[in-house]
A protein has these predicted regions:
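Intrinsically disordered, low-complexity N-terminal regions enriched in serine/proline/glycine
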Residues: 5, 9, 46, 112-115, ...
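Intrinsically disordered, low-complexity regulatory/activation regions of eukaryotic proteins
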Residues: 63-227
Length: 227
């Protein structure tokens, strides 16, 4: 009599006991269990975007294709990296690394994200910059109990420098409100070293001259909000 066996549908390994199969965890089974994880989903969408942009279509690609792809680990590593650094506008970041022909194994490099972010904050819509900055300061307010509009005015100076250097607070906000101007005037040498590359006054003053209506709108919104 042939003993009954239980086969893993992912790796096809056979077991004598169903209970052993139940606790078995092969690489493919693990990947399917991780499918709903945010970082894995970002990896999947990046994988699909890569095929769409480089080969014209990804319509027939499924999660099963992704999970069995030799590039699975690299894309998931990137997805988890985006979650870890709270990357700004992940879809745009993905498009950018593909258009720039960045090697997949370089997508998680800090220098690559910084290069993207420098370009992105210069080109993004004012409304996106305002929304992100206001949302960031509201979360700060929830943590500290201070009014959101006082982040640049009374927030920890190093925390403010970090927020600017990571794109949470855009130069649109820093240059166009009273508290931002005050912060710039009072920065110490270390903070200036961190912040200056991200606010590039020459570039932004030219941008404000080119888009006076946007600047006026930004100033008015921030003034009304008490910034």
């Amino acid at each position: 009599m042939i003993a009954e066996t239980y086969k893993c549908k992912y790796c096809e390994r056979e077991f004598r006991k169903e209970s052993t199969l139940a606790v078995h965890l092969c690489e493919q089974k693990r990947r399917f269990q991780e499918e709903k994880e945010v970082g894995v989903q970002i990896g999947l969408q990046s994988y699909l975007k890569f095929y769409t942009m480089t080969q014209g279509s990804a319509k027939l690609k499924t999660y099963a294709d992704f999970a069995t792809s030799p590039y699975y680990k690299a894309f998931v590593k990137f997805g988890r990296h985006c979650v870890a650094i709270n990357a700004i506008n992940v879809p745009k970041f993905v498009e950018w690394v593909i258009k720039q022909n960045k090697k997949l194994d370089h997508w998680c490099k800090e220098a690559v994200y910084d290069e993207y972010l420098h370009e992105y904050i210069r080109r993004e819509a004012l409304t996106d910059a305002l929304e992100r900055g206001i949302e960031y300061t509201m979360k700060w307010s929830e943590r500290t109990g201070h009014p959101a509009q006082d982040f640049l005015r009374y927030g920890n100076d190093n925390a403010v420098a970090f927020a600017i250097s990571t794109g949470r607070i855009s130069p649109w906000l820093v240059f166009n409100c009273e508290s931002g101007q005050q912060y710039l005037e009072e920065m110490n040498a270390d903070q200036t070293k961190i912040v200056w590359p991200w606010i590039d006054p020459d570039f932004w003053q030219k941008k404000f001259r080119d888009y006076p209506a946007d600047q006026a709108y930004c100033e008015e919104i921030l003034k009304q909000a008490g910034w």
